[in-house]
């Protein structure tokens, strides 16, 4: 359902020893790089320890809802930050999908929201990520980090205590999958980061054993 069965199928293949390369994961590379680079800023380095919420918006053309790419993106964050699932992903009353994860005793809300989009081309594909937002809070600092899909680029911004401290853009690849397929053929070994992200993604959708 909503592409989530595919994630579990890939996970079973990886756990069975097969080498799996996923184009959706490759398409998330720029999203991952931009989000991670925001926290290289001296003011933001320690703010991930105070993360309170993760939100990912995905394209929903018509009524076609696909969540797998967003779940894999959240799974990557969970693997990097060593987050554990408290409440698996489930649909809320307002057509969003929510979950709760934790770092130690600190709980972090997760929200995946299908949205209508105006762009043409790749971003209109169901499940394409159009926005990712992280919010962190501690007694003397509030942090908001966003990566947003524009027409032909991704824009990353970070606001710390009301001040803009990061703003950078990166051009997007074309929608053609040929470069990703060629890259997959060139790789012969397991992708450790992908396997770790996939494991957390499967846990997020309800497999509490992983």
Regions found by a protein language model. Give the residues of each.
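Extended, well-ordered protein cores
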Residues: 1-49, 141-210
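Compositionally biased accessory segments in Actinobacterial proteins
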Residues: 75, 83, 130, 141-143
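ATP/pyrophosphate-binding catalytic subdomain of soluble kinases
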Residues: 28-100
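Short, structured protein-protein interaction patches enriched in aromatics and acidic/basic residues
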Residues: 88-118
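A structural detector for beta-sheet-dominated domains
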Residues: 102, 113, 135-137, 148-150, ...
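Flexible loop/N-cap segments at domain edges
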Residues: 116-124, 128
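Short, surface-exposed beta-strand/loop "edge" segments at domain boundaries and coil↔beta transitions
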Residues: 61-65, 106-110, 137-148
